[in-house]
């Protein structure tokens, strides 16, 4: 079962990688950026000598806040996508609950029918 899921995921990824332009036709290609940690450190260093309440036109305080919120939003999207892939690729943590065969009360009678509770507990079904 796991092998078939793995093969299905691999085929899906192969199909998606072959046609990236058809998946999002209206988006321009992304320009490589600096890693998020460095970008946040640069923005804090640039605005570190200004007060939070300073709203002068040349200060760029609103720009700094917008850059920081955009950066945090990008990080959240990345975390959500990683969680989705983890759920897809790993089996359910309570997989034992969903597997059959070892559930209580599934014993069969002499003719393949389920026995009543007393008969199955005592073994006097047949």
Swiss-Prot record:
Any single GO CC term annotated in Swiss-Prot or TrEMBL for this entry: extracellular space
Propeptide: 24-73
GO terms classed as biological process: angiogenesis; animal organ development; blood vessel diameter maintenance; blood vessel remodeling; c-di-GMP signaling; cellular response to glycoprotein; cGMP biosynthetic process; cGMP-mediated signaling
Location(s), subcellular: Secreted
Sorted UniProt keywords: Cleavage on pair of basic residues, Disulfide bond, Hormone, Osteogenesis, Secreted, Signal, Vasoactive
Residue runs in coiled coils: none
Pfam families: ANP (PF00212)
Signal sequence residues: 1-23
Effect of loss of the gene: Mice are viable perinatally but less than half survive postnatally due to skeletal abnormalities. They display severe dwarfism which is the consequence of a defect in endochondral ossification.
Spans annotated as Disordered: 20-73
Source organism superkingdom: Eukaryota
Disulfide bond annotation, renumbered to this chain: 110-126
Regions of compositional bias (Pro residues) in chain numbering: 26-35
GO molecular function: hormone receptor binding; neuropeptide hormone activity; signaling receptor binding
Protein family membership: Belongs to the natriuretic peptide family.
Protein name, as recorded: C-type natriuretic peptide
Biological classification of the source: Eukaryota, Metazoa, Chordata, Craniata, Vertebrata
